[in-house]
Amino acid sequence: MFPTVPDQILAELARTEGGPDALGLLVRDQDTRRLLVLRAVLDAAEAAGPTVCDAGRKARLREDWAMLADADAATAAADPVQGTVTERALPGVERALPGVERALPGAGRALPGVERPLTPARARLFHPLTGPWARSCLRGLDAGRGTPAEARSLRRDLAHFSAVAAVAAAAAGLPFATRLTARAGVLTLPSLGALHTAASGDVPVDVTHRDGVLTIRQPDAPDVRVHLENGTGAWSGAPAWTPAHALPGLLPSAPPMPLDDLDPYREPPYSTHRGSLSGAATLDDAERKRWLQAWNGTAVALRSGGAHRLTEAAALLRCLVPLEMPPEIGTGRGSCSATRREAFGALLSSTPPDPVTFAATLVHELQHAKLAALTDLVTLHRAGPEARYFAPWRPDPRPYDGLLQGTYSHLAMASYYQRRALLTRPPERDWAWAQHARYHAQVGAALPALVGSPDLTVPGRRFVDEMAATYQRMADHPAPRDHTARAQAYVKSARALWTQRRASALPRPNE
């Protein structure tokens, strides 16, 4: 079911690059895996006992899946290419739930550069934040009968699928009438917006759709009419409605980029204050304007680091999730960012201060997404989880996989800033050389541990060797000596401090 990775593509990715074939392979595989996770959710719900998922909820899941299939069929039938993709449905997904006769089509997606948008149903299921929702469902269903709070969380998770199906059906132009459930006083319709209900709890909300207009009815409140827009967002004159927002497409021909500050699954379920990573933000108009100002120059800044940086961002990035600015960073002095393995295509970031900084953030984070997607297809190493490796960018020891991830992203950053330094003028050039020298020195300090590992597989050896060759080729255009000296001194100091901390953490003799 899963494709093999040709040596040429493995080499491209090891160089932190990747053409349309390489990126298309990763994207299609991640979409395939998303369908399999959804299948696992539906199977787990069917297998769950009545105290975990009762007959009514199972029936509703079947109805929601059928609505998604109807939405997909309605739009795929109007597009011969989409219809062809339908013929390549995943084996075993044809009957994802008993009683549902049609499968959602497989994970077909046009290669980067081919303007073939997903159907509304596929767009919702392959949306990055559907991944965390599915994982949350699986955790709840696999846990069995839990506490009242856990049971309520699972009910909310399963109810969210109804909203996903309704959005897909509305986007496909299908008329319908359905009952949804608001969560803690908020009904979120992914990609459209959110309704703040009159009641503050989990309340039923009746939603009908006809001719591009949703009518939302709730107890003790006037009806709300919401008008769908093409793409992301929907508008209404009701003060209770908050529309979803999007930024312009990264490329002129690209669809708008969702800036999602509404989805209930946009931040991890565990503590969001991991180091300098903050929690999800809800933006006001001023913050959205700052996002737009940074975003408008991001494509140019990406291209200055190589055309492939813009290509990979256009191919891999599906939504942006705003984060709060950590207090230790401060406005205008940087940002925090992350990716989530279960949310392929999402980039979490605080408000970027400028286009160049945000372009660098994209380069850095998309390498994590690329490498995570690649390792779903190829086993690169068999090292254990023990944290014992020095990484110049971290104060703590790293496991081998963490060192590989960090070195890979830093290698891309070294390449990005070297290309910028060779293209830009002072003072941008001097800044780019300083950044390149720092990343290059950090990669040089980390590579020996990666290359020397006996835990590398055959493809892993090829991958790491190509990383090392890419690092060495950068010496053809070295940074000025003063930048190189400062970068090497920084790494030397970081290693000395790391060694000192490690020594103090070890038990003394006879203790």
Regions found by a protein language model. Give the residues of each.
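Extended, well-ordered protein cores
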Residues: D260-T272, A314-P326, S337, R341, ...
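A short, terminal or domain-edge coil/loop segment
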Residues: L371-R382, E386, R429-A441, A479-V491
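Metalloprotease/metallohydrolase-associated module, dominated by Zn2+-dependent proteases
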Residues: T282-D285, L292, T298-R340, P352-P353, ...
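Alpha-helical phosphate/pyrophosphate-handling elements in metalloenzyme active cores
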Residues: L348-S349
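Long amphipathic alpha-helical segments
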Residues: Q367-T379, M413-A414, Q418, L422
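Type-3 copper protein
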Residues: M1-V321, R438-E511
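Post-HEXXH active-site segment of zinc metalloproteases
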Residues: E342, P352-T361, A369-D401
